[in-house]
């Protein structure tokens, strides 16, 4: 414990995490750092699994943070076994959200494993976890425990429902939170059953909220010199994302319903079936509706008293959609794409994934990131969505093997000697995966 406190004090004296430094994380002048990624020098201890937490820490890693991923010996992150598909023995699910991380396999149910995590926390800037509230406290790794040895720490807890309250003890999964938050209630065919979104939007939204909250926590620490606790959860994240649908109910007492691909307040704004596929168009104002009618060669609709305003078009939705649907079905998607090009009307096809990753704009935006994995070889995953003018998001490190960096972290970061490391390996407290 004294060793950990000494490291924490040294960390504080170094200027990291204190107000008044030249930069947020280092003492180097900003004029010399134009090409640096903003989180270079930030170290993150990541005890998260599955999607929300790993997605948050992956995004932090993209910005230059050093992410140390703590995993269970033998099994690791739950998603390592999620599949098919697998590439060799690697789950593509795991590969999708774990780039730019180092893996240390530690048994945190063993007191010696807990000590390792505490020693790492003492020299890290951020601690992220997604255990059920109270679980880590039972092991001595809750916020109160870490705050004692690392008062500078930004501690982010990602849960299903929050730290307190009648449901706080429950485990949280995306689909459950999606259902309880109302997202499934508003997703699916108008007259059909509720539908789960095709990707785990609640997990991803929570990951983005956590990502932003951690960034805010680091800035707060820079200003105050003190760490803090962040409570982030799936239910709150998804309810917050209901935006105008929630406001319709809270302000207008209007219960939401499912609209398929359509929009409850804008007409036309939905997918239309063509001869060979689907095209989504949106006419958000009267001018766009007029342009749409001209492209479709239906000029008589422009001045029709039933469709002159969006309010009227919403009232007469079924009749208008029937007319438009019949017209769109007369041509193939490619023909419509040509006709809408340059019109100012928002439009686009419903793409398969094959279509997505051959789409010219997707290729132009550099959204496919390639990496060389130590056992799989070359892999491709979706890359960062945001680009910056002063630094590049290139040269990503591939997702780690389970325990790939255990020995390195213990020896180079915590300064353990080989004898201690060997003893921990033999006892099963840690695991090291050797690469060729």
Curated annotation (Swiss-Prot):
It catalyses: glutarate + succinyl-CoA = glutaryl-CoA + succinate; 3-hydroxy-3-methylglutarate + succinyl-CoA = (3S)-3-hydroxy-3-methylglutaryl-CoA + succinate; 3-hydroxy-3-methylglutarate + glutaryl-CoA = (3S)-3-hydroxy-3-methylglutaryl-CoA + glutarate; hexanedioate + glutaryl-CoA = hexanedioyl-CoA + glutarate. Its main location: mitochondrion. GO terms for cellular component: mitochondrion. SUPFAM superfamilies: CoA-transferase family III (CaiB/BaiF) (SSF89796). The active site is at 203 (nucleophile). Transmembrane segments: none annotated. The modification N6-acetyllysine is found at residue 392. One of its GO terms (molecular function) is succinate-hydroxymethylglutarate CoA-transferase activity. InterPro entries: CoA-transferase_III_domain, CoA-Trfase_fam_III, CoA-Trfase_III_dom3_sf, CoA-Trfase_III_dom_1_sf. Residues 1-8 form a transit peptide. It is found in: Mitochondrion. Its EC number is 2.8.3.-, 2.8.3.13. Keywords: Acetylation, Mitochondrion, Transferase, Transit peptide. It holds the Pfam family CoA_transf_3. The keyword Mitochondrion applies. The keyword Coiled coil does not apply. Belongs to the CoA-transferase III family. Coenzyme A (CoA) transferase that reversibly catalyzes the transfer of a CoA moiety from a dicarboxyl-CoA to a dicarboxylate in a metabolite recycling process. Displays preference for succinyl-CoA and glutarate-CoA as dicarboxyl-CoA donors and glutarate, succinate, adipate/hexanedioate, itaconate and 3-hydroxy-3-methylglutarate as dicarboxylate acceptors. Acts on intermediates or end products of lysine and tryptophan degradation pathway, in particular catalyzes succinyl-CoA-dependent reesterification of free glutarate into glutaryl-CoA to prevent renal excretion of glutarate. This is Succinyl-CoA:glutarate CoA-transferase. It comes from Rattus norvegicus. The lineage of its organism: Eukaryota, Metazoa, Chordata, Craniata, Vertebrata.
């Amino acid at each position: 414990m004294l060793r950990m406190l000494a490291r924490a004090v040294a960390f504080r004296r170094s200027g990291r995490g204190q107000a008044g430094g030249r930069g947020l994380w280092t003492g180097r002048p900003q004029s010399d750092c134009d090409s640096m990624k903003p989180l270079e020098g930030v170290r993150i201890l990541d005890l998260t699994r599955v999607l929300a937490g790993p997605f948050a820490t992956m995004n932090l890693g993209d910005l230059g943070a050093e992410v140390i991923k703590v995993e269970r010996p033998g099994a690791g992150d739950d998603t390592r076994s999620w599949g098919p598909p697998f590439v060799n023995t690697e789950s593509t699910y795991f590969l999708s959200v774990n780039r730019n991380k180092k893996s240390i396999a530690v048994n945190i149910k063993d007191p010696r494993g807990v000590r390792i995590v505490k020693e790492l926390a003492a020299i890290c800037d951020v601690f992220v976890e997604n255990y059920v509230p109270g679980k880590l406290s039972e092991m001595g790794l809750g916020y109160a425990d870490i705050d004692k040895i690392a008062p500078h720490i930004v501690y982010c807890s990602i849960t299903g429902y929050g730290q307190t309250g009648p449901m706080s003890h429950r485990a949280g999964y995306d689909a459950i939170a999606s259902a309880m938050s109302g997202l499934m209630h508003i997703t699916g065919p108008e007259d059909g059953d509720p539908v789960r979104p095709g990707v785990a939007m609640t997990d991803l939204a929570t990951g983005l909220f956590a990502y932003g909250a951690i960034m805010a926590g680091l800035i707060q620490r820079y200003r105050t010199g003190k760490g803090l606790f962040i409570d982030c959860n799936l239910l709150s994240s998804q309810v917050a994302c209901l935006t105008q649908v929630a406001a319709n109910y809270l302000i207008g007492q209007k219960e939401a319903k499912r609209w398929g691909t359509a929009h409850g307040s804008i007409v036309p704004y939905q997918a239309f079936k063509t001869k060979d596929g689907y095209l989504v168009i949106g006419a958000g104002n009267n001018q766009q509706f007029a342009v749409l009618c001209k492209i479709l060669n239906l000029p008589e609709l422009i001045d029709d008293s039933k469709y002159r305003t969006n309010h009227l078009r919403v009232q007469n939705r079924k009749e208008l959609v029937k007319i438009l649907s019949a017209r769109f079905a007369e041509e193939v998607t490619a023909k419509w794409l040509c006709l809408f090009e340059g019109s100012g009307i928002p439009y686009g096809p419903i793409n398969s994934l094959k279509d997505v990753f051959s789409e010219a704009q997707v290729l132009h935006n550099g959204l496919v990131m390639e990496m060389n994995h130590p056992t799989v070889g070359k892999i491709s995953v979706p890359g960062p969505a945001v680009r910056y003018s002063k630094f590049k998001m290139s040269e990503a490190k591939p997702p780690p093997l389970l325990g790939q960096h255990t020995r390195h972290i213990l020896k180079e970061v915590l300064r353990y000697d080989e004898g201690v490391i060997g003893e921990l390996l033999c006892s099963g407290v840690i695991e090291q995966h050797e690469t060729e």
